[in-house]
UniProtKB/Swiss-Prot annotation:
UniProt keyword list: Cytoplasm, Magnesium, Metal-binding, Transferase
One Pfam assignment: ACPS
Domain of life: Eukaryota
Reactions the enzyme catalyzes: apo-[ACP] + CoA = holo-[ACP] + adenosine 3',5'-bisphosphate + H(+); apo-[ACP] + acetyl-CoA = acetyl-[ACP] + adenosine 3',5'-bisphosphate + H(+)
Keyword Magnesium annotated: yes
Protein residues bound to CoA: 47, 86-91, 108-111, 181-185
Organism of provenance: Mus musculus
Protein name, per record: L-aminoadipate-semialdehyde dehydrogenase-phosphopantetheinyl transferase
Reported cofactor(s): Mg(2+)
Taxonomic classification: Eukaryota, Metazoa, Chordata, Craniata, Vertebrata
Length: 309
C-alpha cells in the first residue's frame, strides 16, 4: 500500500527585529488615523481613544501597530487573526493559543520622546527602553540629580558627573536609565524593583548616531551578570535606546537564525514610516469618525493650528 506523503508545515526563519517609528513627526491625516484605529483590537482602540494628549495616543497606537506588523510578517499569522493580551504587569504578549512556531518568541516595546521602538527575538528574552535627553521640567540639573540620587550607584553617579558640561551629564543619566529599564522590562518585574541592585559599566562613553554597541556590562547584586547582553544605540542626537537580551535555557529552535556577536553588532534599528506600519494591516472594525473627532480636540492638534492659549 502506498501512503500519501506527509504535508510539511514550513516554519519561517526568523532573526531579531529592531524597529523605530517617529511619532513626533507623524501628523496623521483623517484617513490614516481611522485606518490605524480600525486595525487594532477593539479594547485597545477604546483605550487609546481616551488619551488626553495626542502625543500619547500616537505613541500607543504606533506601538500596537508595530506589534501586529511583527506578528503578521515574521510569524505569518494573518493580521485579523492576531490576538494580543496583557500580563498582570501590563506587558503586551501574544495569546497562548496563537499558532506561533516559536514557543519562546519574545518582544517588547517602548515609547518616550519622539519615538516608539520595538525589539523582538525568536528564542531570546528581550526588553527595550528609549529615553530622550531633555531638561528637567522644574529646577536645575543638579537639583534633578539630587532628587534621583537613589536610582543609581555611587560608581554610576561618578560616571555621569565625570563630564564637564551639565547637558552631557544629563545625556549620560538618561543612557543609564534606559539600560536599567531595558533589563527590568526584560525580566518582567514591573514597579518595585530596587534600581540600585543594578550597576552598569558603560562602554564606550561616547556613542555615534546609528551605530550599535555591545560593550556595556551589568553588575547585578555586586556580581557581573554574564547571561545578559546590552545593545545600545542613538537613533538621533537626543534619543538613547537600550536593548537587554538573554539566551534562554534549553535547546534552540532548529529554524531560528542565530548570529554571532560580530553580526549582532550590525543589528541596527530600521526606521519605519506609516505606510510600513500598515503594510499588512487588515481592518477589523467599522470606521468610526468619532475617534478622529476626539483626536482633533487634543493638545497637539491645537498646537499644529497655532491656537494653543
Amino acid at each position: 500500500m502506498v501512503f500519501p506523503a506527509k504535508r510539511l508545515c514550513v516554519v519561517p526563519s526568523m532573526e531579531g527585529v529592531r524597529w523605530a517609528f517617529s511619532c513626533g513627526t507623524w501628523l496623521p491625516s483623517r484617513a490614516e488615523w481611522l485606518l490605524a484605529m480600525r486595525s487594532i483590537q477593539p479594547e485597545e482602540k477604546e483605550r487609546i481613544g481616551k488619551f488626553v494628549f495626542a502625543r500619547d495616543a500616537k505613541a500607543a497606537l504606533a506601538g500596537r501597530l508595530m506589534i501586529r506588523k511583527l506578528v503578521a510578517e515574521k510569524l505569518n499569522i494573518p493580521w485579523d487573526h492576531i490576538r494580543l493580551q496583557r500580563t498582570s504587569k501590563g506587558k503586551p504578549v501574544l495569546a497562548k493559543d496563537s499558532l506561533n512556531p516559536y514557543p519562546n518568541f519574545n518582544f517588547n516595546i517602548s515609547h518616550q520622546g519622539d519615538y516608539a521602538v520595538l525589539a523582538a527575538e525568536p528564542e531570546v528574552q528581550v526588553g527595550i527602553d528609549i529615553m530622550k535627553t531633555s531638561f528637567p521640567g522644574r529646577g536645575s540639573i543638579p537639583e534633578f540629580f539630587h532628587i534621583m540620587k537613589r536610582k543609581f550607584t555611587k560608581k554610576e553617579w561618578e560616571t555621569i558627573r565625570s563630564f564637564n558640561d551639565e547637558w552631557t551629564q544629563l545625556d549620560m543619566f538618561y543612557r543609564h536609565w534606559a539600560l536599567k529599564e531595558s533589563f527590568i522590562k526584560a525580566i518582567g518585574v514591573g514597579l518595585g524593583f530596587e534600581m540600585q541592585r543594578l550597576e552598569f559599566d558603560v562602554s564606550p562613553l561616547n556613542m555615534d548616531i546609528g551605530q550599535v554597541y555591545k560593550e556595556t556590562c551589568l553588575i547585578l547584586d555586586g556580581e557581573e551578570e554574564k547571561e545578559w547582553a546590552f545593545e545600545e544605540s542613538k537613533i538621533d542626537e537626543h534619543h538613547f535606546v537600550a536593548v537587554a537580551v538573554r539566551k534562554p535555557d534549553g535547546s534552540r529552535h532548529q529554524n531560528v537564525s542565530y548570529q554571532d556577536d560580530s553580526k549582532l553588532s550590525q543589528r541596527k534599528f530600521t526606521i519605519l514610516n506609516f505606510n510600513d506600519l500598515v503594510a499588512s494591516a487588515i481592518p477589523m472594525t467599522p470606521e468610526d469618525p468619532s475617534f478622529w473627532d476626539c483626536f482633533c480636540f487634543t493638545e497637539e492638534i491645537l498646537i499644529r493650528n497655532g491656537t494653543k492659549s
